[in-house]
Amino acid sequence: MLDLTYETPKPKVIAGAREDWELVIGLEVHAQVATNAKLFSGASTLFGAEPNSNVAFVDAGMPGMLPVINEECVAQAVRTGLGLKAAINLTSAFDRKNYFYPDLPQGYQISQLYHPIVGEGEVLVELGDGTARVVRIERIHLEQDAGKSIHDMDPHMSFVDLNRTGVALMEIVSRPDIRGPEEAAAYVSKLRQIMRYLGTCDGNMQNGNLRADVNVSVCRPGDYEKYQASQDFSHLGTRCEIKNMNSLRFIQQAIEYEARRQIAIIEDGGSVTQETRLYDPDKGETRSMRSKEEAHDYRYFPDPDLLPLEIEQAWVDDIAAALPELPDAKKARFITEFGLSDYDASVLTADTTNAAYFEAVAGEAGDGKLAANWVINELFGRLKKEDHDITESPVSPAQLAGIIKLIKADAISGKIAKDLFEIVYTEGGDPAEIVEARGMKQVTDTGAIEAAVDEIIAANPAQVAKAQENPKLAGWFVGQVMKATGGKANPKAVNQIVAAKLAQQ
């Protein structure tokens, strides 16, 4: 763990009609593995292809077709495990999860129930208010995705697209450590950030590449502590699972609704039924899908077509040695190396491209704090207005660093720098050359500034008298000098000269 000090957030407390209740949440996150081919076939994983165009015989469940494991899928699972500080199991095995669904042509899903490839790990989830929680990871296992059933193309029939069938998924299972809707969303967001840094999952929830099954239960204050002491899950209440959540906002909304639904049932004298539910974002409610299955309902058994998966420690060590710097480590380095605030470091490390852009600017400009200020406030602010991200920035790191270097050299003022940024953003060009060509260079000649100050003081004796009674009114003279020089006068020099001249009156 990083040596960072955070307070643990308090659990979400929901007031029922009769008493207070606390939330308990665990998540099963399904992350599509970033590979070009599927888990057990060479078929493409390209999103958006023509329906049923990325389907190998083994994906379609054709008789006699045997699965052959994709080594890169295994490597990506190992990378993810290492990124989550998890134990890597050198021996794992695949099992068949048997159930019928039209978009599952094999009649079973190949998964890892008994011997997953990754064991226990953890992830630090920061909530932005100075609090953070360490969420324990129970396991990560590899499994096949199912296809897609399409019900809205024809009123009389459904269609099946098998392009997604057999695509590799990592199922990341957390312990019931999450205590509120915001924590749940922050946890999924942090997992996505880590996997994007690792390059193991692109995290695009809108494409279904990252989905979460959310387990929700409620308990009375004090019961969670009993669970922690005994590891007896009965203290946590009966959980319901909300399937296939693909939006951070919907995850929070679904948890809020489901918790209140369960509280109402219990306080009315009923009992919560363990079941699988779906969230309807249009109605803002969850609805029953089916009774919650247990492992024995799926008749798991070892897949006879696949030998146990055995990997070598040396191979794992090679993967570990090649891991990139991860978000927590990068954030800590930005704070110490560049003197950034916790907030600024969090914003800049939210994405690898943001972090790389900032480092390039800071390195060339030689000023991390100034670089962070310009990247976050000016560049990100402007990009957000146009709904663009950093990869679409018309201002290169070298150009932004050039603007910052002109500020540091007192060649331009902060106001002129913003005008210059706008020119570079819309028209491009070298900042130094633009300043020279357009006469934007800051006036640093104290003689010229003194002359302007003398002229304004002489023309405004009444204002001078007011400023002598109230020194704060000296700012009026500063503004008049800046206006007279077209904003080109050095603000620091203007302030000093105005103060000195007024003192002499």
Swiss-Prot record:
Pfam families: GatB_N, GatB_Yqey. One of its GO terms (molecular function) is asparaginyl-tRNA synthase (glutamine-hydrolyzing) activity. One of its GO terms (biological process) is glutaminyl-tRNAGln biosynthesis via transamidation. Its EC number is 6.3.5.-. SMART domains: GatB_Yqey. SUPFAM superfamilies: GatB/YqeY motif (SSF89095), Glutamine synthetase/guanido kinase (SSF55931). It catalyses: L-glutamyl-tRNA(Gln) + L-glutamine + ATP + H2O = L-glutaminyl-tRNA(Gln) + L-glutamate + ADP + phosphate + H(+); L-aspartyl-tRNA(Asn) + L-glutamine + ATP + H2O = L-asparaginyl-tRNA(Asn) + L-glutamate + ADP + phosphate + 2 H(+). Keywords: ATP-binding, Ligase, Nucleotide-binding, Protein biosynthesis. PROSITE patterns: GATB. Belongs to the GatB/GatE family. GatB subfamily. Heterotrimer of A, B and C subunits. Allows the formation of correctly charged Asn-tRNA(Asn) or Gln-tRNA(Gln) through the transamidation of misacylated Asp-tRNA(Asn) or Glu-tRNA(Gln) in organisms which lack either or both of asparaginyl-tRNA or glutaminyl-tRNA synthetases. The reaction takes place in the presence of glutamine and ATP through an activated phospho-Asp-tRNA(Asn) or phospho-Glu-tRNA(Gln). PANTHER family: GLUTAMYL-TRNA GLN AMIDOTRANSFERASE SUBUNIT B MITOCHONDRIAL AND PROKARYOTIC PET112-RELATED, GLUTAMYL-TRNA(GLN) AMIDOTRANSFERASE SUBUNIT B, MITOCHONDRIAL. This is Aspartyl/glutamyl-tRNA(Asn/Gln) amidotransferase subunit B.
